[in-house]
Design a protein with these regions (language model features):
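Single conserved hydrophobic/aromatic residue that forms the stacking wall/gate
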Residues: 1-7, 11
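N-terminal alpha-helical segment
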Residues: 3, 54-55, 94
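Basic, short loop/linker segments at the boundary and entry of helix-turn-helix/winged-helix-like folds
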Residues: 18-60
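A short secondary-structure junction motif
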Residues: 32-37, 80, 84, 482
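A Lys/Arg-rich helix-loop hairpin that forms a DNA/phosphate-binding surface
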Residues: 46-47, 87-91
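Anion-binding and metal-coordination hotspots
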Residues: 59, 66-78, 91-535
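Short active-site-adjacent helix-start/loop capping segments
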Residues: 69, 84-85
């Protein structure tokens, strides 16, 4: 007689993932990282709620797969086999756990240490070369309300109006209640507090009952105390806003580190300002080796602190050359690289493209189109008149660098037929008949720009400039277009830096996987097929 057997359902507990899947490469690379600083970032009290190594793995892989929100990452950990493979049998973390890890742990030095270890690992295995670093910047919108702007100049005007109003109205109000108090032209917050304290003391001494509501008549001293409170609150707010602005011209009320700036994505086509951050990235062999998040709208002031950060992170490993675009050119940046000759600078001068046009070369008002005599230190204008050096002017940058500017003037401009073409208006209120030609020249900057023009025109300079466009700008294109990232999720400079750190790790793993699959390991510079052979 046949034996009946109960049917059984076979459940496979192993996760089948392709051998060449990016998640396997990510897991193998992240297992070689030292997480001692990451664990040290946690408090010593209590236990760690979830393994930070696993959290970092799932977050980096999520950024590789366009899943960057904490709730999307939580859902992926429950449903996606690749994320389950990274969990190593543990339960899926809660979205609050993921968010706390991103905001509180990666914002510290431990996050930058992980990127540094990854770069050094690639460098020691010959996959990354530090011979040339390509730096570029882009503006990314902050997670702040669009119309939450505070303008520094407007706040300064409001402060002046408020101080003027206090200076004009306060004496009469004090005279009405019989209080004597010295009022300076610009009264400070502490002086208003001192006056308010005296008013409260008078109210207590006289036994005055403070009233409010309809049908109640306030005493003059109560109206004065309320007026002082209003002025004091406004003055405190204006002082705080100016302090938050610092060297900037604006900030957002919902993200104090964000600055209002022009974005490339201007859908309204009206030049609308949006709160954002200036993200600077250094790339070597397609890999991101460092990033610098700035609230400055201009790239000029970000190069030196970025280089100091790279020198600190990779101490003992010298970066041979740094290639940047024309937005980073300044005399101060030239001087910094002259003081650090171990790193060579390649920057395209701002007038590099303009010089090629006939309009620029035929502009007689420009110093570059005038003949210069080094022996007599004079310039000769288009009409044959001499511009002689009359004085030397000293200026200082924000960091304290002294810049010497030579002033050249021409005293023979009366009756010149080329005067209107040679002297530009520039908003001057003087009539053209009373004006004369004046040019301001920084000889050191002119020498540095001339030397840089020759350097970037060489064969090596042309190759490096081409690779800067491919490698540095290519990373931004991949993040914005392929990963569809146009706006930060977190607020604050430190948290934004942690968010961009995850993108840097994700991009490096993706580049490494792509190089392995296409067998392009060890290729540092790309030579386009259209590149001139003679350069």
């Amino acid at each position: 007689k046949a034996i009946r057997r109960q049917r059984q359902m076979c459940i496979r507990d192993r996760v089948n993932i392709e051998k060449n899947a990016p998640v396997r490469l990510l897991n193998a690379v992240m297992e070689r990282i030292d997480y001692s600083k990451l664990y040290a970032a946690y408090s010593r009290l209590g236990r760690i709620e979830y393994s930070p190594k696993i959290l970092l793995k799932i977050m980096v892989y999520g950024y590789m797969r366009k899943q960057i929100s904490s709730r999307a990452l939580e859902a992926c950990c429950r449903e996606n086999l690749h994320f389950i493979y990274l969990l190593e049998g543990q339960c899926a973390p809660d979205h609050n756990t993921i968010n706390r890890f991103r905001k509180n742990i990666l914002t510290q030095e431990a996050g930058q240490d992980i990127l540094r270890q990854l770069v050094i690992m690639l460098h020691e295995r010959g996959l990354l070369s530090l011979e040339a670093a390509f730096i570029d910047g882009t503006k990314i919108e902050a997670n702040a309300n669009k119309y939450s702007f505070v303008w520094k100049k407007a706040t300064a005007k409001k402060t002046d109006k408020l101080l003027k109003r206090i200076h004009e109205e306060l004496p009469a109000k004090l005279k009405e209640v019989g209080i004597r108090f010295y009022i300076p032209e610009k009264i400070a917050v502490r002086q208003l507090k001192k006056l308010r304290k005296r008013i409260y003391a008078r109210i207590d001494a006289d036994g005055i009952v403070l009233v409010s509501g309809k049908g109640k008549r306030k005493t003059p001293i109560q109206r004065l105390s309320e007026w002082i409170d209003q002025c004091l609150a406004k003055l405190k707010q204006y002082t705080k806003d100016i302090h938050i602005c610092g060297n900037r011209n604006s900030f957002s009320k919902t993200d104090h580190d964000a600055t209002f700036m022009h974005m490339k994505e201007d859908y309204m086509r009206n030049g609308q300002l949006k709160p954002g951050y200036n993200v600077n990235v250094a790339t070597c062999s397609d890999f991101i080796i460092g990033s610098y998040i700035s609230s400055d709208r201009n790239d000029v002031h970000t190069l030196i602190p970025f280089m100091e950060q790279l020198r600190k992170n990779y101490a003992g490993r010298n970066i041979g050359s740094v290639v940047v675009d024309s937005g980073y050119e300044s005399e101060e940046n030239y001087c910094w690289f002259e003081a650090h000759p171990e790193t060579e600078l390649y920057v395209k001068p701002r007038n590099h493209e303009a010089v090629k046009h006939r309009k620029y070369r035929t502009d007689i008002s420009r110093r570059e189109n005038m003949a210069y005599d080094a022996q007599t230190d004079t310039y000769t204008c288009a009409n044959g008149k001499l511009l002689q050096r009359t004085r030397e002017k000293k200026t200082h940058t924000a960091s304290g660098l002294e810049i010497a500017i030579s002033v050249y003037e021409c005293n023979e401009c009366d009756g010149c037929p080329l005067k209107e073409k040679c002297i530009r208006a520039c908003g001057s209120k003087k009539p053209m008949e009373e004006r004369y030609k004046v040019i301001y020249v920084s000889k050191r900057f002119a020498r540095q720009r001339q030397a840089m023009e020759a350097k970037i025109s060489s064969s090596k300079g042309c190759l490096l400039r081409v690779n800067r466009s491919i490698q540095a700008e290519g990373n931004f294109a991949y993040v914005k277009q392929d990963l569809d990232f146009r706006r930060f999720l977190l607020r604050g400079n430190m948290k934004v830096a942690a968010e961009w750190l995850l993108f840097s790790l994700a991009l490096n793993i993706l580049h490494l996987h792509h190089k392995i699959q296409n067998r392009r390991l060890g290729s540092d510079l790309k030579i386009p097929s259209s590149f001139p052979a003679g350069l």
